[in-house]
Regions:
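Conserved beta-strand position immediately N-terminal to the Walker
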Residues: 1, 65, 103
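Conserved AAA+ ATPase small/helical "lid" subdomain
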Residues: 157-204, 208-223
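C-terminal engagement/docking regions of AAA+ P-loop ATPases
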Residues: 177, 201-286
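Walker B catalytic acidic pair
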Residues: 5, 68-69, 80
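Walker A/P-loop
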Residues: 1-32
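Conserved alpha-helical scaffold flanking the Walker A/P-loop in AAA+ ATPase domains
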Residues: 46-66
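Residue-level signature of catalytic and energy-coupling elements of molecular machines
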Residues: 3, 40, 81, 128, ...
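Canonical AAA+ ATPase core
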Residues: 47-52, 73, 85-182, 231-233
Length: 286
């Protein structure tokens, strides 16, 4: 999951809280320009006592990994991160080490600051299943947050304040497998394909003039992600089958970082969410 927002909206706290709710291992990596792949993945260290190399695994070998401000890490380190995400394993000194299951990467980025940052390439952005954009809270929500801070006498709301029973790793694995068993009809599959194909200028009802706004549409990986998330949404709704509303509910999160706009569209102030709105509105619902 990629989380984007301006500073001060608790991206890091939200990611930490999600990981803390599950009793699995959690590691946080503060990304900086000098962060090396070995700092993340691990390395081999020579032990003078035994005269042998020993493998020290890095922080990415955890159930939940928070990559804070991922766009501050250099391209080489970003590639190492996303290789682990894609393959579910790392290679240290020629030795292939599998990552624990479940494995989830939560990355945050600040879209405003550009100095000392390295934007994620399109191919690497596509590795993220979802991209969530956090917006400012409403005045009522901000007032409730302030009231919570005042009552607790603390200036921060941290994940360590969570009380109650946490979800076990085995529970998460069970829910993942249960979601995969949710029925997806042929009509829903075609609907998911139609949504992503429309972003590429194809589909059953191509959008006129889309090529002047979009230079790169969503890949087939987006179709898979949209279907998987639809299955999870159906499971959480108490159904054993997927309906079109399950896909539409998360179309923005799945597609917004996979649709690359043209320079003309960016100059006119067009954002990818507007394109997704048009796609969802245009594609016929089965």
């Amino acid at each position: 999951i990629l989380i984007e927002s301006v500073p001060g909206l608790a991206k890091t706290t939200a990611a930490q809280t999600l990981a803390t709710c599950v009793s699995g291992s959690f590691k946080r990596v503060q990304c900086t320009p000098d962060l090396m792949p070995s700092d993340l993945v691990g390395t081999q260290v020579f032990d003078f006592a035994s005269q042998k190399f020993t493998t020290q695994i890095g922080p990415i070998h955890a159930n939940f990994v928070l990559l804070d401000e991922i766009n501050r890490s250099n391209a080489k380190t970003q590639s190492a991160m996303l290789e682990a995400m894609a393959e579910g394993a790392t290679t240290i000194g020629g030795q292939r080490i599998a990552l624990p299951k479940p494995f989830m990467v939560i990355a945050t980025e600040n879209p405003i600051e550009e100095e000392g940052t390295f934007n994620l390439p399109e191919a690497q952005m596509d590795r993220f299943m979802m991209k969530a954009v956090m917006t400012y809270p409403s005045p009522d929500e901000e007032a409730r947050m302030l009231a919570m801070l005042t009552r607790r006498g603390s200036d921060m709301i941290g994940p360590d304040t969570i009380t109650g029973e946490r979800i076990s790793v085995s529970d998460v694995d069970f829910l993942r497998k249960a979601a995969r068993r949710v029925h997806v009809s042929d009509a829903i599959m075609r609907y998911a394909v139609d949504i992503t194909a429309t972003s590429r200028g194809a589909g059953s009802r191509p959008i006129k003039g889309l090529s002047s706004l979009v230079r790169l549409g969503a890949s087939p990986r987006a179709t898979t992600a949209l279907t998987r998330i639809g299955q999870a949404k159906a499971l959480l709704s108490g159904r054993d089958y997927v309906v079109p509303e399950d896909l539409k509910a998360f179309a923005h999160e799945v597609l917004r970082h996979r649709i690359m706009l043209t320079f003309e569209a960016l100059a006119d102030g067009v954002v990818s969410d507007q394109i997704v709105d048009k796609i969802v509105e245009t594609v016929p619902v089965p």
